[in-house]
């Protein structure tokens, strides 16, 4: 399922971490069908790799307003699915 185009809408994050988040989300979308499971996979991977506490929202239709740590935020689309990933706490 490599036909999902990544479109980064907003990011306060290093290029390397942005690339990592897209790759991690791609793996999650290939492995899981349920949005909650996709979000859990991404969150757990980022907690492991970049230390806690990460939060992840996955879906096709949601609004958000969050506070995040500097350089630890990304909002992007993979195909039709939006992914919000940020560190706070």
Swiss-Prot record:
Residue(s) carrying N6-acetyllysine: 36
CDD domains given in the database record: DLC-like_DYNLL1_DYNLL2
Function: Acts as one of several non-catalytic accessory components of the cytoplasmic dynein 1 complex that are thought to be involved in linking dynein to cargos and to adapter proteins that regulate dynein function. Cytoplasmic dynein 1 acts as a motor for the intracellular retrograde motility of vesicles and organelles along microtubules. May play a role in changing or maintaining the spatial distribution of cytoskeletal structures. In addition to its role in cytoskeleton and transport, acts as a protein-protein adapter, which inhibits and/or sequesters target proteins.
SUPFAM superfamilies hit by this protein: DLC
Residues bearing PTM Phosphoserine: 88
Keyword Glycosyltransferase found: no
GO cellular component, as recorded: axon cytoplasm; centrosome; ciliary tip; cilium; cytoplasm; cytoplasmic dynein complex; cytoskeleton; cytosol
Description of post-translational modifications: Phosphorylation at Ser-88 promotes recruitment to DNA double-strand breaks (DSBs) by TP53BP1 and ability to inhibit MRE11. Phosphorylation at Ser-88 appears to control the dimer-monomer transition. According to PubMed:15193260, it is phosphorylated at Ser-88 by PAK1, however, according to PubMed:18650427, the DYNLL1 dimer is not accessible for PAK1 and the phosphorylation could not be demonstrated in vitro.
Domain of life: Eukaryota
InterPro entries hit by this protein: DLC_sf, Dynein_light_1/2_CS, Dynein_light_chain_typ-1/2
Full protein name: Dynein light chain 1, cytoplasmic
Cell compartments where the protein resides: Cytoplasm, Cytoskeleton, Microtubule organizing center, Centrosome; Chromosome; Cytoplasm, Cytoskeleton; Nucleus
Subunit structure of this chain's protein: Homodimer. Monomer; the monomeric form is incapable of binding to target proteins. The cytoplasmic dynein 1 complex consists of two catalytic heavy chains (HCs) and a number of non-catalytic subunits presented by intermediate chains (ICs), light intermediate chains (LICs) and light chains (LCs); the composition seems to vary in respect to the IC, LIC and LC composition. The heavy chain homodimer serves as a scaffold for the probable homodimeric assembly of the respective non-catalytic subunits. The ICs and LICs bind directly to the HC dimer and the LCs assemble on the IC dimer. (Microbial infection) Interacts with human spumaretrovirus Gag protein; this interaction is critical for intracellular microtubule-dependent viral genome transport toward the centrosome.
Chief place of localization: cytoplasm
GO molecular function: deoxyribonuclease inhibitor activity; dynein intermediate chain binding; enzyme binding; enzyme inhibitor activity; identical protein binding; nitric-oxide synthase inhibitor activity; protein-containing complex binding; scaffold protein binding
Induction: Up-regulated by ATMIN, PAK1 and estrogen.
Summary of the tissues where the protein is detected: Ubiquitous. Expressed in testis.
Residue ranges, annotated region (Interaction with ESR1): 67-89
Keywords: Acetylation, Activator, Apoptosis, Chromosome, Cytoplasm, Cytoskeleton, DNA damage, Dynein, Host-virus interaction, Isopeptide bond, Microtubule, Mitochondrion, Motor protein, Nucleus, Phosphoprotein, Transcription, Transcription regulation, Transport, Ubl conjugation
Lineage per the UniProt record: Eukaryota, Metazoa, Chordata, Craniata, Vertebrata
GO BP field: apoptotic process; DNA damage response; intraciliary retrograde transport; motile cilium assembly; negative regulation of DNA strand resection involved in replication fork processing; negative regulation of nitric oxide biosynthetic process; negative regulation of phosphorylation; positive regulation of insulin secretion involved in cellular response to glucose stimulus
SMART domains per UniProt: Dynein_light
């Amino acid at each position: 399922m490599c036909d999902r185009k990544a479109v980064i809408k907003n990011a306060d994050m290093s290029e390397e971490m942005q690339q990592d988040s897209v790759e991690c989300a791609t793996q999650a979308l290939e492995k899981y069908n349920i949005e909650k499971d996709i979000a859990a996979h991404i969150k757990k991977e980022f907690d492991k790799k970049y230390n806690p506490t990460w939060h992840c929202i996955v879906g096709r239709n949601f609004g958000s307003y969050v506070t995040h740590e500097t350089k630890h935020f990304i909002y992007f689309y993979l195909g039709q699915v939006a992914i919000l990933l940020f560190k706070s706490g």
